Amino acid sequence: MEIQQTHRKINRPLVSLALVGALVSITPQQSHAAFFTTVIIPAIVGGIATGTAVGTVSGLLSWGLKQAEEANKTPDKPDKVWRIQAGKGFNEFPNKEYDLYRSLLSSKIDGGWDWGNAARHYWVKGGQQNKLEVDMKDAVGTYTLSGLRNFTGGDLDVNMQKATLRLGQFNGNSFTSYKDSADRTTRVDFNAKNISIDNFVEINNRVGSGAGRKASSTVLTLQASEGITSDKNAEISLYDGATLNLASSSVKLMGNVWMGRLQYVGAYLAPSYSTINTSKVTGEVNFNHLTVGDKNAAQAGIIANKKTNIGTLDLWQSAGLNIIAPPEGGYKDKPNNTPSQSGAKNDKNESAKNDKQESSQNNSNTQVINPPNSAQKTEVQPTQVIDGPFAGGKDTVVNINRINTNADGTIRVGGFKASLTTNAAHLHIGKGGVNLSNQASGRSLIVENLTGNITVDGPLRVNNQVGGYALAGSSANFEFKAGTDTKNGTATFNNDISLGRFVNLKVDAHTANFKGIDTGNGGFNTLDFSGVTDKVNINKLITASTNVAVKNFNINELIVKTNGISVGEYTHFSEDIGSQSRINTVRLETGTRSLFSGGVKFKGGEKLVIDEFYYSPWNYFDARNIKNVEITNKLAFGPQGSPWGTSKLMFNNLTLGQNAVMDYSQFSNLTIQGDFINNQGTINYLVRGGKVATLSVGNAAAMMFNNDIDSATGFYKPLIKINSAQDLIKNTEHVLLKAKIIGYGNVSTGTNGISNVNLEEQFKERLALYNNNNRMDTCVVRNTDDIKACGMAIGDQSMVNNPDNYKYLIGKAWKNIGISKTANGSKISVYYLGNSTPTENGGNTTNLPTNTTSNARSANNALAQNAPFAQPSATPNLVAINQHDFGTIESVFELANRSKDIDTLYANSGAQGRDLLQTLLIDSHDAGYARKMIDATSANEITKQLNTATTTLNNIASLEHKTSGLQTLSLSNAMILNSRLVNLSRRHTNHIDSFAKRLQALKDQKFASLESAAEVLYQFAPKYEKPTNVWANAIGGTSLNNGSNASLYGTSAGVDAYLNGQVEAIVGGFGSYGYSSFNNRANSLNSGANNTNFGVYSRIFANQHEFDFEAQGALGSDQSSLNFKSALLQDLNQSYHYLAYSAATRASYGYDFAFFRNALVLKPSVGVSYNHLGSTNFKSNSTNQVALKNGSSSQHLFNASANVEARYYYGDTSYFYMNAGVLQEFAHVGSNNAASLNTFKVNAARNPLNTHARVMMGGELKLAKEVFLNLGVVYLHNLISNIGHFASNLGMRYSF
């Protein structure tokens, strides 16, 4: 039987397979049956193939148990066993190469045509129920097996332990099976010294088209004492039901290994499972490229050895790979007296009987063995041991340089999820990192190590971009789980992580370590570390409207960006942060104004420690839900604040740690709703406009100080410093701090209390006023330099210029009686009358001790916790309803004792805002829910959010918004079509210079005999003056609309020609595609649309008169979503889809004025046009009562226009033009159905008659003989709504 020897590479549609994480073994032949151990099989199967969840070792599909049992069962008993023994001639020539099929196999393998599958296939002689054993254990040399395609069984066992096997030298091999009532498994076993795979190998593929019988299961075993390798072009494909066993000292597969290939076209929904077993490889296993899945939810498993290396791992969007590492000590071999071993011996003995009873021997060393006529005996199977999941040994490693997911455009609710699972001690992802291919509806990747650690050295990419963003209306989700079962795994990320918009990261582990995370590239990310049970360590975290779920963390640096996000879009630490959380440095970046502010807020926690805190204008820090926040080093304003910039810092209880410094000014806007403890820190007050800002404490304040003296100045270390105090407004009390209760304590003496006059006086000595760096409330004078400093502080030039006149002050402390201080149980303040002047006998002095540092003390670190002066918060009173009916939003405000907020609501948001709030909180929920929402939100914030929502809803109802993508595409095409008409209107240019150049080129030329000189003139005439053209352009556009972001990009192509018959005319047609996106200022409305535009255009010439005609149509498919982040508006979040369409016709007349030998043409023109715009009705996918609905809309517009165009032609083909004009709408009719939310309706306002001004320009240059480059830009401005539209194009033209 001949088999094909032609070269062939596989190129078939493939399927995905769903796996088993079960170790699958076989019993190939008696000589090495014990090599593939089976004692561990049932335990592994029981531990990892129970349950139904995909993606975890302990929860694989139940099929795993089925396939493992089938592959591990006693091989199917053959009807006949054919045996071939290689003669001694094969033992003599180690350098000789043989064709294994022709030399030994062909006599016992039949072949034929499979009509059902329309392909040829091969089988063991006599049928798939027979077996072929080839004994060539002493053979040497190299044996090739090439072109054994569609081998459908039965079992094939080749023992060539001393020889080299080359699979697929000229053609590939395919080993498969047929599904029949016996459900047989095809087992193919090659045992060689070395095995190299040079072409494709298929395991359990369907024969031919796959339309006939399907495959059952196939086990291919490759054993090599030295090594198994594959060429880079040799692809190994495992189909549904395939198992590949590899046993060697090392395995190195350079070609792609594809697990889960499609067996036939259309098998995308069919279940599919495959397994690779490398547990008997003693060295490293290397996969250069491993692919799992082919357009379906394939699951695959690798029963691994200690070290598995994968270069690139490609996962289909819903595929899963499970890599099972061996336990500590490895897999244990089965004892020799196990039932299965006995069974094997019995089989051998029974075969021996057959040899004696019904054997026939011939000179070809071939023996036919028939089974006995007696009935087959019942076999007793081994006892199955059910075990739980196990951890990989401590030295087990899985290395993957790069993980990549592949996806298509299929949309499914919840998106698709790919997974990688292992139990190795270490899962290491290299410098290649992880790439997640994102499509509409979202894509996710789960990387899980059930019992070990995960390390990622490379970046995280979305659609092959670091910082890449998810498509509109979708999300991209990375998920890493370390030590899921042991609760003791560590996840480490050694590269900076940059996440674009709507890209999320989830990490579950005992400990998680990150180099850096940046979510400030657009915001709306989730960092979910709530599954980390011990500590999350982040070197640098950059956020902007990011949801951070984390507890007990160490963040070296936290940078909070505003990034153009609207008010209310904060970075939200959405989990209780616990009691062990610390941030070394917090930096709030400067916003631009209130509409572009941001910040950070916390859901709750026991304690947060911050070393350094730098805040900036228009950024917010809300830690009111954290019980205690401590600043240990610095709380300071970052970049110098501008007069309009306000920062807001909000705390529950705040502690300023020992030696910490806090800057405070009018820009700080610090709120402390609970207690404030200054534990030997310093508060720096900045004077602005002659005033200081008052630090207000909601409950109690404690001022803890010590007796330490600064030896350089002689002063006690101050707790409060007022800088530039000389600028304070005189005769005015300046309150520095006020609280319900203020207590004072001296930690050096261990005394503290409330209303303790002695402690209050001690504190006043630590309240210092400075003029520059010189203290002005008290002067400690030790020498003449101190006299000068005192003079500069109080503004006394005499002391500065003549310090000797004031030597009587040396050795004394002088008190400036122009400054009085108050420190009592409710406030701390200063009163500035103006500076007094020291006199020799004026008093107000105190003698200094001989050694000014003798009274210094070492302050202890006692904190004033549970201060005796703390008081509980008052409980607010409830006010009965007496003005409004129950069930209205007004009644809820009144019940909350916020009646004034009703007026604020109507004043700032109007009746429409009130109705929307009624719909969201009461009509869709109840009064209790409404009370909960308004209690959590101020009146100003409610009106801001309502105004944002109504603006967004008005956008949704607007037909102008729905067709904006089509209008931008039409504007782009108008620019391109005008350029084409300018190009083909070169009617007046006489090409004098060009023609002269051509005549000059003919000088001294000699030609063969021609019928006429016309042929010469034609050859050198300008051929490209009026050509037929094919053109294509890349287009882009954007709308400048009050902060909204609307853009379009796409392509346009067409064909046109100049007709020079009885009528001179230009005719052409075009088609274009553009993808448009829209994000409003609040980023609450996101849209993406696919738009098409097509039409025809023409120009007719009559002397210098030009008549233009144009007709076009457009269609757009829009997918939009509402994405409000605030709890108040969360019910509005939903997505919807609609179609937008337009049709337009235009006619215009113009007259050409030619100048400069017809190179310059000026053309005034007038025209009229008609536009029909419309959109279909839609209903959102929301299940809430506020599901958005909108009816269809339609509008007819009639316009008139006037334009002036200048064209300049130079050379033979190049030109430049500029066109400016005005378009006026003079009539419009149509309908606009209201958008509705439950009982709330949004009626789109009818637009006024618009006036547009338009300027466009462009030109073209010749690149090659018949190829031209053109460029154009256009700007359209709506003079009524003040909205601008900009578009540009870059394209090529080919003339023929």
Swiss-Prot record:
InterPro entries: Autotransporte_beta, Autotransporte_beta_dom_sf, OM_autotransptr_brl_dom, Vacuolating_cytotoxin. The keyword Membrane applies. Coiled coil: none annotated. Residues 1023-1296 form the Autotransporter domain. Residues 1-33 form the signal peptide. GO terms for cellular component: cell outer membrane; cell surface; extracellular region; periplasmic space. Residues 359-380 have a biased composition (Polar residues). Pfam families: VacA. Residues 326-380 are annotated as: Disordered. SUPFAM superfamilies: Autotransporter (SSF103515). GO terms for molecular function: toxin activity. Residues 345-358 have a biased composition (Basic and acidic residues). Keywords: Cell outer membrane, Membrane, Periplasm, Secreted, Signal, Toxin, Transmembrane, Transmembrane beta strand, Virulence. NCBIfam families: autotrans_barl. The signal peptide, cleaved at the inner membrane, guides the autotransporter protein to the periplasmic space. Then, insertion of the C-terminal translocator domain in the outer membrane forms a hydrophilic pore for the translocation of the passenger domain to the bacterial cell surface, with subsequent cleavage. Induces vacuolation of eukaryotic cells. Causes ulceration and gastric lesions. This is Vacuolating cytotoxin autotransporter. It comes from Helicobacter pylori. The lineage of its organism: Bacteria, Pseudomonadati, Campylobacterota, Epsilonproteobacteria, Campylobacterales.
